[in-house]
Amino acid sequence: MQIKRLQIDDYLCLVDFDIVFDTVSGGSSTILIGENGAGKSTMIECILNILMSFDSPAIEKQIDYSYSMEYNYAQKAVCIVQSNHNYRITVDDVFCEGSYKRVRSFIQSHSLFPQRIIAFYSGVNNKLL
């Protein structure tokens, strides 16, 4: 999975947050370096919440911010946009929009997420566990 862009409207310290990652053919690793409190761990936590929300209705209900995430996975270009629990999911040129229940089945039928996600953090943070 290679994240290309992440936009968050208001999650903890990420307010009007918009980051574009450089992407290279064949994938690459990204390292986040910055001052304490800059939002590195918060961004990772937010990405994990987005990904886990499609496996857990309880996590989805906790997401009270709008977001957009563009990424490549398994030779597919994916864009997920959520605002007020209304979704628009685009996979290449195919899209689905609507409620959580509707888009969740679409996502599961298209295998849009990796089976395992690894986040490494060198400080103390109980939220990423």
Task: Please report, for each region that a protein language model flagged, where it lies by residue.
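P-loop NTPase switch/coupling surface
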Residues: 1-129
